[in-house]
Amino acid sequence: MSHVLGFRELGRMDYEPVWHAMQRFTNERGTSAEDEIWLVEHPPVFTQGQAGKAEHLLLPGDIPVVQVDRGGQVTYHGPGQLVAYLLLDVRKLGFGVRDLVSRMEACLIELLASYGVTAAAKPDAPGVYVDGAKIASLGLRIRHGCSFHGLALNVDMDLAPFRRINPCGYAGLAMTQLSDHATPIKFAEVSARLRAQLVKHLDYAEQTTLTGGID
């Protein structure tokens, strides 16, 4: 396994093509395939996980709802939110699912600390929280020992659509974002800091930017 973790910077892309691409990547990767992390922003979309219940979709309105194959309940993605899809061979890395989730949470907590924001994880509700409000969501799927889906960090976005759902299945869960706690915020800088933290917490030595498309 390489000691270099590859990142793809996808910019802003619709959710479904990226989801289908990560499914293909996971289904077709061989034992020699290198791990990748895809960084992306999505146009407004609700995604409903495998445990999702219809009653948690309160008033989706004109925002599309996509039923997906990750764990967890419903969440929202939109512009100003940094999404990282972790396409990892967790068998080679030697991580259990709980260990991987803990590493993802630690990565986010340290990133937020670099902006002077104190955040914490909750043992019974995966994700990262600031003063009880959720700032980052996690959702994974493991197939053939490899992960896909990942994490979403609210950076500087319109949080109003979260009020149209029970985020992650919790009625009335308060949501927050980095720009509410630290200014000024540059999205590209947050992305760079996230990359560095993922390299550290996934036990890689270096990172590189991958070129080419995902389809």
Swiss-Prot record:
It catalyses: octanoyl-[ACP] + L-lysyl-[protein] = N(6)-octanoyl-L-lysyl-[protein] + holo-[ACP] + H(+). Substrate binds at R70, G71, G72, Q73, V74, T75, Y76, H77, S137, L138, G139, G150, L151, A152. Pathway: Protein modification; protein lipoylation via endogenous pathway; protein N(6)-(lipoyl)lysine from octanoyl-[acyl-carrier-protein]: step 1/2. Residues 31-206 form the BPL/LPL catalytic domain. GO terms for cellular component: cytoplasm. GO terms for biological process: protein modification process. Signal peptide: none annotated. Gene3D superfamilies: Bira Bifunctional Protein, Domain 2. PROSITE patterns: BPL_LPL_CATALYTIC, LIPB. Its main location: cytoplasm. It is found in: Cytoplasm. GO terms for molecular function: lipoyl(octanoyl) transferase activity. Keywords: Acyltransferase, Cytoplasm, Transferase. The record marks K134 as: Lowers pKa of active site Cys. Its EC number is 2.3.1.181. SUPFAM superfamilies: Class II aaRS and biotin synthetases (SSF55681). The keyword Transmembrane does not apply. In the reaction, the free carboxyl group of octanoic acid is attached via an amide linkage to the epsilon-amino group of a specific lysine residue of lipoyl domains of lipoate-dependent enzymes. NCBIfam families: lipB (TIGR00214), PRK14342.1 (NF010922). Catalyzes the transfer of endogenously produced octanoic acid from octanoyl-acyl-carrier-protein onto the lipoyl domains of lipoate-dependent enzymes. Lipoyl-ACP can also act as a substrate although octanoyl-ACP is likely to be the physiological substrate. Belongs to the LipB family. This is Octanoyltransferase.
